[in-house]
Regions:
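Hydrophobic transmembrane alpha-helices
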Residues: 1-55
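Hydrophobic alpha-helical transmembrane segments
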Residues: 7-12, 32, 54-58, 74-75, ...
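Transmembrane alpha-helical core residues of multi-pass small-molecule transporters
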Residues: 13, 56-64, 80-81, 103-108
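Interfacial aromatic-anchored transmembrane helix boundaries in multi-pass membrane proteins
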Residues: 22-30, 61-90
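Mid-bilayer segments of alpha-helical transmembrane spans in multi-pass integral membrane proteins
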Residues: 70, 105-122, 147, 151
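Short helix-perturbing small/polar motifs within transmembrane alpha-helices
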Residues: 78-117
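Membrane-interface helix termini and inter-helical loops of multi-pass transporters
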Residues: 122-137
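Alpha-helical transmembrane segments and their cytosolic interface
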Residues: 136-182
Length: 182
């Protein structure tokens, strides 16, 4: 495929992702929109390769820093939800399914702790700063609920990828003017 088609495709997906990130200013979309934008980059990853999907992720991240997006959502997008769907595809290419699951779980927990560190220490959004016990209980609760949400998110990504291959890939490839290699 010509590089102009790849660049144009990345530009379109980056623009769409950036516009969606602007929706994080609406409180109900605080965590859902960054997850959806990350899912959006599965198409460039599956059709063009991981480096092009990471390019879309990088462009959207930089534009999110420049434009007026909700900072907490942007931290979650840059630190976890934006790159995870791309990394998931790369991790699932490993031969050992157990190693892949352990690696994904470790990546998620490290990224989640890092995101919350940035949110609390850099952005200063710690509402339980003076209450040590409550903050500890809250942190453990967030990790537990976050891991449950991660499992659901990972399963949903897998099913979404399967649905893409079954129902939408042919149309996307036609729109991108790619030869059908199915």
């Amino acid at each position: 495929m010509r590089s102009t088609v790849k660049i144009t495709t990345c530009g379109i997906f980056s623009a769409l992702g950036t516009v969606l990130l602007l929706g994080t200013n609406i409180p109900i979309f605080l965590y859902t929109v960054p997850a959806i934008v990350g899912i959006l980059f599965l198409i460039p990853c599956l059709e063009l390769g991981a480096k092009w999907a990471f390019l879309c992720y990088g462009v959207t991240s930089v534009l999110g820093l420049i434009l007026p997006t909700e900072r907490e959502a942007l931290v979650m997008y840059i630190g976890l939800l934006g790159f995870y769907p791309i990394v998931k595809i790369l991790i699932e290419r490993l031969k050992s399914r157990i190693a892949g699951t352990v690696l994904k779980t470790l990546l998620f927990n490290a990224a989640l702790v890092g995101c919350f560190f940035v949110i609390i220490k850099v952005l200063g959004l710690n509402v339980l700063q003076n209450e040590r016990f409550s903050a500890t209980v809250m942190a453990v609760g967030i990790l537990l609920i976050g891991n449950l949400a991660f499992i659901v998110y990972d399963i949903a990504l897998t099913r979404g990828i399967n649905l893409y291959f079954i129902k939408f890939r042919r149309s996307v490839r036609r729109a991108l003017r790619m030869k059908n290699e199915l």
